[in-house]
Design a protein with these regions (language model features):
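Short secondary-structure boundary segments
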Residues: 44
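Short coil/turn segments at secondary-structure boundaries
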Residues: 65-69, 84-91, 122-124, 442
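N-terminal active-site wall of soluble small-molecule enzyme domains
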Residues: 2-3
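Helix-enriched interaction subdomains in cytosolic or periplasmic regions
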Residues: 64, 78-109, 314, 319
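C-terminal non-catalytic regions of proteins with extracellular/luminal or membrane-system context
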Residues: 6-7, 12-14, 20-29, 47-49, ...
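Long, well-ordered, tryptophan-enriched scaffold segments
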Residues: 36, 49-84
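Structural preference for beta-strand elements that scaffold enzyme active sites
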Residues: 16-18, 38-39
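Mobile "lid/hinge" segments at catalytic clefts and subdomain interfaces of large enzymes
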Residues: 27, 33-41
Length: 619
């Protein structure tokens, strides 16, 4: 995009680094070269290399553009002292106590108490606690796709609650339901011999002939970005590579075992030589592996406890990069749902931890609904009916529908809180940390109550963002649609009172807002005061109000402080398309001080004169 990447980013803004593509996103040589792209990733590229050289020779790409790209890449390499290092340094990971403390604090500070009718913080008289939910023992601490990293350790809610609460409390655990989008990995502890699968790479289509090499791999998701076939499969050097995964598997429970396979290319699954799944003869488009994968196919096999079975998956790479998936779900030893309901009935208090995982919230595909995956809503409703002393913990990275919200007495959104998630959660549940997180987005009551709903998914995978300026809380204001929980919402274990708003307009249209916030409760807490600006003559295509400033202040019980939020001229401006500048319109502006987009406590009005073409962008 020449205007954005060359004219604005590089020329107007003076950016002297280089522009890199998303992985596999560069599809055209000339358009990318002339549009400002400097580095194609991953390498070796498809649109650079020989294709770029041909475009230069044909006069379709100016050689001066290539010189600029090379200069930018070398400049960054020099700045990062790349030329002073020889070879690759070994990867390092630093795990220090100060890092752990910071991670724990950040996780706790980000948790948002959505609703609390007296259940939190937890009381000290609990005798029997039920920890329920698919995210209790194995929470989702990080997003899927490229956001997935390998932490030094992980602290999950169930283990943290058991280790931190009074040992006299009788604690039970029940999963409640499965939530996987794709079946989980084969249990390595039930494989005979070395850990994981024996993976054999063959040159050609015939399995068993022309073996290149073999290795053992653990897991169920095998792709080039995590080492699988990285040095083996090359369409240039070896256009026909086949891979066989095999292991001896001894189930620890009898019954129907469900298997699942898919990948970029063709794959099939055999158990004791009998084909169970054919995702080879005919494949359909899927959404995994950045939508390059075939659609999932599943098969059921009746396996007997204690007997050894030979599992084989055959795979032929055909597509963008090598990737294949194998999952297996053994039968449950008991009714997970009924186990959870029984545990809830027998407990004084329930901590119910639900949510999503890296299959549901990841890059490469959209969420098409706001419901919690699988049977979690059903589980929540049943547990709430069994025990009103239930705290619902939502371990998800984005908004979800909550059809059970009226029946819940306490709900907290924890997001994907990192490796210290469990400890941070217990800190907040017990009151060691008073929750102070605020919602960075509006939570709708249902998916239809979202700005983009009427435009999604568009036509032929092309969607216009026709909500334009009315995104998030701006759309809810203008449409008069109430959100389930508004932007900026978040409760505390204490209460705050606002008073005495004073507004002053000083030079260059700078505005100061001063007001008093008092902690009227019994415990220390932090309040996030938000300042919104509303122009009296805004059109229907514009937001009614916009957040322009905020301040977070920690207050002791009964303490009050004067809070000051300063707004610059830029905070009252709009972008004029005709003059291509930030301008202020003459008229009345209302300043609204509140604790969320829907909870406004103080108001004041000021008058500003028109200012044209003199405003600098915020830095």
């Amino acid at each position: 995009h020449q205007e954005l990447l060359i004219d604005i980013l590089k020329a107007e803004w003076g950016f002297d680094g280089y522009v890199v593509s998303d992985w596999g996103a560069a599809l055209e040589t000339e358009a990318n070269a002339n549009g400002g792209l400097d580095l194609e990733m991953p390498g070796p590229g498809n649109v650079w290399g020989a294709s770029l050289l041909s475009a230069i020779k044909d006069g379709k790409v100016d050689e001066e553009l290539i010189d600029d790209k090379v200069k930018r890449i070398l400049t960054v390499a020099e700045f990062s002292k790349k030329f002073e290092r020889h070879g690759f340094n070994p990867e390092e990971a630093i795990d220090q106590p100060t890092h752990r403390t910071l991670l724990r604090k950040a996780a706790a500070d980000g948790m948002v108490l959505l609703k609390n009718d007296g259940l939190l913080p937890l009381q000290s008289n609990i005798k029997k606690l039920a920890i329920i939910g698919p995210n209790a023992k194995h929470a989702q601490i990080i997003g899927g796709g490229s956001a997935s990293l390998k932490p030094h350790y992980e602290v999950h809610p169930e283990e943290a609650l058991r280790s931190r609460l009074d040992p006299e409390i009788d604690i039970t655990y029940a999963k409640g339901c499965h939530t996987h989008k794709y079946l989980p990995r084969v249990n390595e502890s039930l494989m005979d011999g070395e850990q994981g699968f024996l993976v054999e790479y063959f040159d050609g289509h015939n399995f068993g002939e022309n073996l290149i090499l073999s290795e053992h791999l653990i897991g169920n998701k095998f792709w080039v970005f995590e080492g699988f076939a990285k040095e083996i499969i090359s369409k240039q050097a070896r256009p026909n590579i086949s891979v066989r995964f095999s292991c001896a598997y001894t189930p620890n429970i009898s019954g129907h075992h469900e298997f699942e396979i898919f990948g970029i290319g063709q794959c099939r699954l055999l158990v004791d030589g009998q084909e169970v799944i054919d995702n080879w003869t005919q494949t359909d488009p899927g959404e995994a592996f950045f939508t390059f994968s075939s659609a999932s196919k599943k098969g059921m096999v009746d396996l007997q406890q204690g007997r050894s079975y030979n599992i084989e998956m055959e795979y032929h790479f055909e597509g963008s990069f090598p990737a294949v998936y194998l999952g297996c779900q053994a039968p449950d030893a008991m009714d997970l749902f009924q186990e959870a309901v029984t545990a809830a009935k027998d407990a004084d208090q329930v901590i119910l931890i639900v949510g999503t995982n890296s299959d549901w919230e990841t890059e490469g595909n959209d969420r098409v609904e706001f419901s919690l995956p699988a049977d979690q809503n059903k589980l929540i409703e049943a547990v709430l009916h069994a025990n009103q002393n239930t705290v619902v913990i939502v371990n998800a990275g984005s908004p979800i529908e909550m059809p059970w919200i009226d029946d819940a007495n306490a709900v907290m959104q924890t997001w994907f809180a990192g490796q210290e998630f469990g400890n941070a959660l217990v800190d907040v549940l017990t009151g060691e940390v008073n929750p102070s997180g605020r919602l960075p987005t509006s939570f709708p009551k249902k998916i239809e109550d979202t700005p983009a709903y009427q435009f999604y998914p568009g036509t032929n995978q092309q969607m216009n963002y026709d909500e334009k300026l009315l995104v998030g809380y701006r759309w809810y204001d203008r449409s008069s649609v109430p959100a389930l929980f508004p932007f900026g919402h978040g409760l505390s274990y204490t209460q705050f009172q606002y008073s005495n708003l004073e507004v002053q307009v000083i030079k260059n249209n700078q505005v100061t807002c001063k007001f008093i916030v008092k902690n009227t409760g019994l415990v220390m807490g932090a309040e996030v005061s938000q300042c919104y600006v509303a122009f009296e003559h805004s059109t229907n295509a514009e937001p009614i109000k916009t957040l322009q400033g905020f301040a977070k202040e920690i207050l002791n019980p009964q303490e009050e402080k004067q809070i000051e939020i300063t707004l610059a001229a830029r905070n009252f401006s709009y972008w004029d398309i005709s003059t291509k500048s930030w301008e202020i319109r003459q008229g009345s502006y209302e300043l609204l001080i509140g604790s969320s987009a829907s909870n406004i406590h103080l108001r004041a009005t000021i008058m500003l004169e028109q200012v044209q073409g003199v405003l600098e962008p915020l830095v």
